[in-house]
């Protein structure tokens, strides 16, 4: 049996998202969180990552039962697995992490450029949504409804690792995260390319059903509590609301995004 795995020590990071600092004078990163490595755990995130030809792997830890299941799922593995006890993975994660006997260390996926988005794309843009559970759930919905990408800001976005990857349940391998320095500038660029920029807010000026949807389309979602920032809102062609008949009129942002994606898919 291999010796217990010891992860790299994180460098001091202050309040930087992702927990890693950049060297002095280095250019801003091109991925959310500026991470040096991604940690994935759980069956779905690990299986989908191992199937992704664009991933570069560093280390795979697996319990005996999990390794058997992994080989049944995908056959030959692209990285050699190290057999460990469940407790060894437990020590690497928070107590509430459900790892199912799998822990994968790999390189972060590259972030594509805005210019690479197709001319008929439906994409999401997240305005400083920082909760990794929400962003992961949004990625999962984006994969389910065929969104081409999710645009996030380099700062004020969770790193594409750990909790986010677990919440995405493998969707991180199918929907690229496009990391931009300034969301407003990105929306201006997309507008020049002909994208319909549709913001969402519970107090939106128009009901979603009244908007003439077309492609290319970028749907802009704001953080819970803060909503869309002023410049973001001003750059949207419409700010729509979801009509809900019940006593609670405000939805979790990941739920609202799923509903918006479903509505857009039905009106193609």
Predicted regions and their residues:
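RNA substrate-binding interface of SAM-dependent RNA methyltransferases
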Residues: 62, 119-206
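Active-site/ligand-binding-proximal alpha/beta "capping" segment
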Residues: 198-252
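Short, acidic/turn-prone active-site loops that include or flank metal/cofactor-
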Residues: 65, 86-89, 155-156, 224-226, ...
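Structured adenosyl-cofactor binding patch, chiefly the S-adenosyl-L-methionine
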Residues: 47, 52, 143-144, 163-171, ...
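N-terminal positively charged helical leader segments and presequences
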Residues: 1-113
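Short basic, glycine-rich beta-strand/loop surfaces that mediate nucleic-acid
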Residues: 96-107, 171-172, 214-222
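Short glycine/serine/threonine-rich phosphate/pyrophosphate-binding segments
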Residues: 133-137, 228, 253
